[in-house]
Regions:
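Acidic-leg catalytic submotif of subtilisin-like serine proteases
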Residues: 1-33, 48, 52
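Extracellular S/T/G-rich loop segment that most often corresponds to the catalytic His/Ser-adjacent loop
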Residues: 6, 24-25, 141-219, 223
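N-terminal domain-start motif of subtilase-like serine proteases
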Residues: 1-4, 30-43, 135, 162-165, ...
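Substrate-binding/access-modulating region of protease and related hydrolase catalytic domains
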Residues: 76-148, 175-176, 191-207, 246, ...
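Subtilisin-like peptidase catalytic core
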Residues: 33-109, 152-156, 237-240
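Solvent-exposed loop/turn segments at secondary-structure junctions
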Residues: 8-11, 28, 58-59, 77-80, ...
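C-terminal subdomain of the subtilisin-like protease fold in secreted/lumenal serine endopeptidases
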Residues: 100-102, 219-263
Length: 263
């Protein structure tokens, strides 16, 4: 079960039918709205990221990274990113028993507001996979810049880091650079509310690739912990010929390599 905190998700889209196990919507005070609505998405961002994680095959080769995964999807971005909504969604996801949380959102700079819940996710054996941001080198967003998060930047199909992908160095020991790794985040085609498809770009699109890959590895190696899954992902990474560690850190992960590392 993968936690998905975004603008919601269109549960009627063919690629997401049967994929959304839980859905919730939160108000500006971080309270769950009841009765809960059927899964929907007034924006499109969340439907795109949800289908990247767990989209079922509809036609051709369009399919999510982990098409057998189920989602606990929370609408926490509605007319802007509100801290209380995100905190409410994170707490709700913990209560649903997720093993991975994918958050393609963030607040510019370093905000400590989400640190306690991110640490709680870790303490519960949940892998927090968060976007680093889209403001370029020398910048990052919270909670994607926490040491406790698996921070994701973007890369192109030819394994280059696009200018928009954020990266930043912090004074905190060995793991001082964010993002931790990069994933495809340019021209990504995924679901659009209403049954269609659209291409989008950003670290928002890269993050669900990594969350989906983590879910696949957890399915293949169910006895492995979130920390072990993360370690395998990190050790599977390789820098592309034009990637640098200050922008891509470890580089691009490989599912087959990570699975071999898990034994």
């Amino acid at each position: 079960l993968v936690g998905h905190l975004d603008t919601g998700a269109d549960g009627r889209h063919p690629a997401l039918r049967g994929a959304i196990r839980h859905f919730a919507e939160f108000d500006d005070l971080g309270r769950e709205r009841r009765p809960g609505p059927r899964a929907y998405d007034p924006d499109g961002h969340g439907t795109h990221t949800a289908a990247t994680i767990a989209g079922r095959k509809v036609r051709g080769t369009l399919v999510g990274v982990a098409p057998g995964a189920r989602l606990a999807s929370a609408m926490v971005i509605e007319g802007g990113e509100v801290v209380a909504r995100v905190l409410g969604g994170m707490d709700w996801a913990i209560g649903r028993g997720v093993r991975v949380v994918s958050m393609s959102l963030g607040f510019p700079g370093y905000w400590p507001d989400f640190l306690a819940l991110t640490r709680l996710l870790r303490g519960r054996g949940v892998l927090p996979v968060f976007a680093v941001g889209n403001e370029g080198a020398g910048t990052s967003r919270s909670p994607g810049n926490y040491a406790e998060a698996l921070s994701v930047g973007a890369c192109t199909r030819d394994r280059k880091v696009p200018r928009f992908s954020s990266s930043q160095r912090f004074r905190r020991g060995a793991d001082a650079v964010v993002p931790d790794l990069v994933a495809p985040g340019v021209g990504i085609v995924s679901a659009r509310p209403g049954g269609g498809w659209q291409a989008m770009g950003g670290t928002s699109m890269a993050t669900p690739h990594v969350a989906g890959l983590a879910a696949l590895l957890m399915e293949a190696a169910p006895k492995k912990t979130a920390d072990e899954i993360e370690r395998a992902l990190f050790e599977s990474c390789r820098l592309g010929p034009e990637m640098t560690a200050d922008r891509a850190h470890r580089g691009l992960p490989s599912g087959p390599r990570a699975l071999r590392l898990l034994g």
